[in-house]
């Protein structure tokens, strides 16, 4: 049955929002490739890829090789719930199949022949598994691996903006970043010399690298420059040989004449592009130039005397008049020079070459080796192999497919994607592009553009760690292979998986990217999994990240949310993925667009990353369209390269999918986001994640439509994976029989255990409640049970309250909140929090600790709630200092008195010398015991409490199994009905009792008979062979499914009774869960969804609250001054829309209660909702369904106003008029204390308010006497340490200003760090002598010791009787003046 919801959105969104957790789940699935058959696993991806990069492992002599064949992941030993309860990691065992090949080597030929092959399956440790919610359970706590946003491998061109050198010259540079391997940097200095750095080491001229690659001087010049040829003729005349591509804008030295004598360019006139074309067309071969044209040009090759062979000049030498004369004398009449006169070609490469004195390839390679390995002297072979490994060897250098893709894209290359090393052509092309950039002063690449930043997802992060572990293991394997006789070894002798396990454990346990999941509510869970962090290993650090990295970039549109980011030092470094964004195979974030052709929006959807969006003209999602999808306006607002422009509709190429595609889910939950200031929207989206799930959830009257998606995808609800039927429902369990192939092993039947009083990571209480009934037919994607903070399948983090914006006696000062006592009385904002306390009994040197009820010197009253085993009973109400678990610890032997010795001698029993170390309730905790777990050693004895818990757990499992089996049997019976009902039975079937017959021979079977028969007895029961075959066909899988279920439940029962693996030295461990009910109290922090936060300052009786003319009081009073300066007007729009919704809902309920005709009610509903979908839904419903739906609207009509596509001002006014409210949103309120009307009309309405997890009960704290710091002897600070309040410098000034000297002395001595004074004070209070005697504060002694540590000896001298200081001349003068 659909819900009656008022939709204000106008844009139809054709693409569903992708599953919000796909990012995590798909990535890890791709890494594991678990369900993929061995033959189909992709060898370059995930785990398979990691094994293939490390294996085969050969020994140093190449006589043996260890090859990887395949891997297999087993079933986890414990399920998720058991791992959380026992503090274990949710992981699965892994086995790998490896092959050891031993070779015989022929020393003469060097060939190898296979001598022996051994293949073996080896246990290879465990691998943490991801839960279906996208989290990992590590040591019993749920953790999330946050995705990392980092610089993409590839090439990037940058310049310094003229900031580096004093000349303010812009210096260009380029950097090639691989996934693994050496970084390569090229940069120009202020003299235009090109330098190279490898791995950020000392720079050297870049031509050394070219020579090391095997290029000669001439080849370098030939690659970077085009050559021009000049003819040297008589009488110092010089002719330039014309080549069409070498146009130069010069003045003609002499008339340029064609073959017919026509002058094309006169002497002294410039050669234009038009005249250049005419010169080329006329076939003119050479143009006469000025005699000094060649001065300062550079030779393209060596010049030698043709007669003698003597070298006159080398390539790249500068041409001088003297050199020209020598060339003429030697009879050289043609000379080739480098073309550097053009405005886009400088002589920088030639200048670099002249600076570089390295003659050949060998010397160049040795020079590079020397720079990178300064300590070891190179030989030619070592240097050559080292250079080869730098960029050409895939074992040492990996660009990754992403790097190759970026390189091909930026340098316009066409290399295959599996070429993951650098080629010489890559390097030379990069330099060519860099030189061109410098010469043409082109723009640098933008490193903050999302085309240059990629996301490393969970799978990739874990894959990298796995590779590190395998490389460590590889070293150990190689050493083992060389140390022992290889022919006698088996593969398992070589492989030790411990290094891999250690690396994984470290990553999941302590990495900066493996975080304790934020589990305050369902939204905080989802947003944590969709978070992108620029921090972490290989990323930025908070301190070094500048403003540019943190800022919003135009390429973020539709990919990264510009709103949701933390306030404080991490702002802009931790961001969130937008609603529709996906991450592609290369790790770049993509956003979807509709393709637009000739002004018509098509249904075709394109997912584009930021670099492919480059020149596209993108229209906004709210551009007006006609019925056929054509753009209505001739000129449309579009985005081009991040800039907003107006373009003709025919130029538009793409269109946004939805207005909400530019914000994250958290921001998309804020109605009227478009009317809020960005800073407040940021606070609003962050504070929704801090909302505590309340005792009774209530969905917002004003929502955005995203609530359903968040609730469904969060994992907090139970969602049907396929169509099916509800077989059984109670508060703890739902059993569903599904159609199709889901849960095939269990016969399509799945039993869900609902969470009850589950403690979340943030100590909030998670529980699920069923939202279905037995016999109900459910569809795929339907919600079967609501989770915490979810109401009717929608996210519901707060409550709808009637709000008034008005000052009230100063109780709203500085954003304070005045709230009605009704919210406390009716538990509107009551939440449950669960605290866990743990006690451990250990084996000590003096004997074992014991958990017992028998505690010395403790009254029976203190023990009243403990059972025989000394553990508190479930349901007991506890308060601070109550005993939860009784425990005694043996004390050291003490000297016995003669009397005690006598008693021991008489009674023989050694009187127990133990101290009470029981677990007590800490201060500030008051609640009810809801759960106790006892963990015993496997071999240890079990106490009564453990046996009782085991008995209860086993009974619950038995009941579950019975329900599951019943559902499976009913499902099988339903399948049998069409085959067996009405068919004749071959033989009579006896019952369990003596003489009882269930079915007579020859009788036709009815449905009633079938219901009473055991299903297994139907095998071979019928006369007809076809019927028996059909029955056998159905019963065969049934038997397998029954066996499978029995095996599962038997294993669970075994686990209940088998005992636990406890840490060494631990005998027993007890965990106690206390549920604490926290009602709203003064000091609690509350907030709306628009960043309007405040602290409750007063809880006022209902009768004193301002009230409406009809006597209804408002629930909450907010300060009107909090709105204008903060510019979050969205809250006012929400208030007005919510008021209309509540009022209309109330009117409909009155109509229903007054017994109005059904048709009248239907027409009223249709006119309010005015939507074709709702009209159809209303017509479909029968009267009972319709009544139930209208009754749900009693507290208000749920409205949806999507972000950037919500209700307009006009729509809100007409909605309020429809409800009979004033269209300015104000009304007259009356003072609850006097009954008089307030002077001005007040803005009132309904606002959705949240209670945040900053609760006063968890922060308030008081200290009497407590722990002191060891060195300074001052009280510790903070609630966790039971510390005191610090009296700082400014507080001392305040007391000095009041002249409160004795008070100050008391604060700074006996109440703080005067050790002897503290003891004396105590004694005096005991004696009733309240006189302060302060001593020396310990901090003075600390100061003295610190001075001593500086070598200054400070000693204190007590003066006998104070002597008057000697009067100096200066003092005499001062006294005389006085």
Curated annotation (Swiss-Prot):
One GO BP: DNA-templated transcription
Keywords: DNA-directed RNA polymerase, Nucleotidyltransferase, Transcription, Transferase
Database matches in CDD domains: RNA_pol_B_RPB2
Gene3D superfamilies recorded: 2.40.50.100, 2.40.50.150, 3.90.1100.10, 6.10.140.1670, DNA-directed RNA polymerase, beta subunit, external 1 domain, DNA-directed RNA polymerase, subunit 2, domain 6, RNA polymerase alpha subunit dimerisation domain, RNA polymerase Rpb2, domain 2
Superkingdom assignment: Bacteria
Annotated region (Disordered), positions in chain: 1359-1378
Cited Pfam families: RNA_pol_Rpb2_1, RNA_pol_Rpb2_2, RNA_pol_Rpb2_3, RNA_pol_Rpb2_45, RNA_pol_Rpb2_6, RNA_pol_Rpb2_7
Record's catalysed reaction(s): RNA(n) + a ribonucleoside 5'-triphosphate = RNA(n+1) + diphosphate
Cellular-component GO terms for this entry: DNA-directed RNA polymerase complex
Single annotated GO MF: ribonucleoside binding
EC number(s) on file: 2.7.7.6
Heme in keyword set: no
Job of this protein: DNA-dependent RNA polymerase catalyzes the transcription of DNA into RNA using the four ribonucleoside triphosphates as substrates.
Similarity-based family: Belongs to the RNA polymerase beta chain family.
Subunit-level organization: The RNAP catalytic core consists of 2 alpha, 1 beta, 1 beta' and 1 omega subunit. When a sigma factor is associated with the core the holoenzyme is formed, which can initiate transcription.
Protein name, per record: DNA-directed RNA polymerase subunit beta
Source organism: Desulfovibrio desulfuricans (strain ATCC 27774 / DSM 6949 / MB)
